[in-house]
Amino acid sequence: CLVVKLSAEVTDLSESMRLTLKNGTGRVIACLTNCVQEGVHKGEFPVNLDAKTVTEEIYYMWIGATLLTKVGRTHAALECAMNATKERLGLN
């Protein structure tokens, strides 16, 4: 993931790059939030789901899982993130 690779390297060195990454991740989260909201409206996800909060939690979890996958060279963190995502969205 580009965000994972660049964020640790360039955010301390370049304010403009930090702001670009911040803007980009904000747009990704906004897009995913819209998808979750649409799923709630279609009855695919629980009605009581706070789409923005859930989306942020899931996004942050996947960023962490991506980092741990690189460090551990195993897919365990990604599998854990997938299971947690399904549970959080009520898909289990």
Q: Model-flagged regions — what are they?
A:
Residues G26-K42, K52, E57, M61, ...:
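C-terminal peripheral helix-coil segments that are non-catalytic and often amphipathic
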Residues E15-R18, K22, G26:
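Short amphipathic alpha-helical segments with heptad-repeat character
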